C-alpha cells in the first residue's frame, strides 16, 4: 500500500513507533489485531517511502508485486524475513486455526512448508508476482525445516480499507 505497509498484529499496538534499519523512526502502527487475527498496518513518514517489492535479501532479485490473487493449495510460495531472508515452499492448507504456545488462538491462516524463525514475523509472502500475506508463526527452523502460517493479505487490506501498492 502506498504510504505504509502491512505486518503481523503481534508485532505492535496502535500508536507504537516503528523504526527502520538505521534505527530512525519510519512510522507508526495505525492498526493491529491480535489474537483472533494476526495483522496490522504501519503508516510511514519522516523521509521513508514504500516500494511494490518483496525483498530478496541478495539471495534472489527483489520480487515485484503486481496483485494479490490467492495461490491455491499446492502452489509455490516464498517468504521474506528479517532473520532468515528468502525461503520458499508450497501452500499446504487454508483457513486454518492455530493455537500458539502462549495460548493465543488465531483464525483464517494459510499454512505453508516454508521455514521461519524468530524475528521473521510480519515478513511478506509472495507467489510469483502476487502478494499472499504476512508471517504469523510456525514450528521448526530453517536448518531442520518446519511449517509456517501467514495471515492472507486480502483480509488485511479489506479490514483496514487499504489498497495494495503494485508495480
Q: PLM ranges: what are they?
A:
Residues 1-98, 126-128:
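Serine endopeptidase catalytic core focused on the charge-relay Asp
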Residues 51-59, 85-167:
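Active-site region of chymotrypsin-like
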